[in-house]
Amino acid sequence: MKQIEWKSYFNHTLGFLKYFGQRFNSDNTNITAGHLTYVSMLSLVPLLVVMFTVFSAFPMFDELKENLEQALFANLLPTSGEQLEEYLNEFVTNASKMTAIGVGFLFIVAIMLMSAIDKALNSIWRDSSSRHWLVSFAVYWMLLTLGPVLIGSGLAATSYLMSLSQFADEYVSGIQSFVLWFVPIVTSFVFFVLMYQLVPNRQVKFRYAAFGAVIAALLFELSKQLFSLYITFFPTYQAIYGALATIPILIVWIYLSWLIVLIGAVLTVSLEEYQLQQPEPKSD
């Protein structure tokens, strides 16, 4: 009996993976990731300017601004973060000297990135309906203004947890290391769940969004470690590109990040569709 159950479970899993592969290819996920990478490269500096501008409006987060910068640059690029931070800080400083019209233009460019993300995810859900442009603009504006506040609150909570873990590590060895490993995964999981549930124009059940978010969060953390190892032990890119080596590395990392985001989205919608296609169990 158990052998039959395991065989059924194996066939069910194999069928789902096959369906996921077909969905991944039919949605041209790798091409979509490339498009989002291109838009992200254009929108990166405007988005950072908008975020830091909003942060400066809340003095309570002044102490956390440096932590936010470190977290952003660590996730933007697992290695070469210091060099990237130097470049982007220079860009942000130059952009902050712009007039009100220039800052407004930066907001528009940042909103273009969010619009591209919206369209990409809804294309995966194959939802042709669209929000009114005023509603979309209001949502994007709210995310741009409230997003930094939520990030600041999350960093404050993370800093508090880290201080507690450092204290507890004196009594139980390994707690701080566990928190350092666990908190980024939980943060990524929450981010992906919110994205997969709120961005699509149709209702997505939490269990499906959570499934895709777990896989995406684990892949994201694993890719950071593997990418760091590759950059550290196989630095051939530096010999080829020299001082410009950070640029292609950043492009590749942003592409991998978007690919993971889209993989999680395809997993979420594939699981939902595959479950609906399965015949209902016969009642005795």
Swiss-Prot record:
It is found in: Cell inner membrane. Pfam families: Virul_fac_BrkB. InterPro entries: UPF0761_bac, Virul_fac_BrkB. Its main location: membrane. GO terms for cellular component: plasma membrane. It is a multi-pass membrane protein. It comes from the Bacteria. The chain crosses the membrane at residues 41-61, 98-118, 137-157, 178-198, 214-234, 247-267. Keywords: Cell inner membrane, Cell membrane, Membrane, Transmembrane, Transmembrane helix. PANTHER family: INNER MEMBRANE PROTEIN YHJD, UPF0761 MEMBRANE PROTEIN YIHY. NCBIfam families: PRK01637.1 (NF002457), yihY_not_rbn (TIGR00765). Belongs to the UPF0761 family. This is UPF0761 membrane protein IL2447. It comes from Idiomarina loihiensis (strain ATCC BAA-735 / DSM 15497 / L2-TR). The lineage of its organism: Bacteria, Pseudomonadati, Pseudomonadota, Gammaproteobacteria, Alteromonadales.
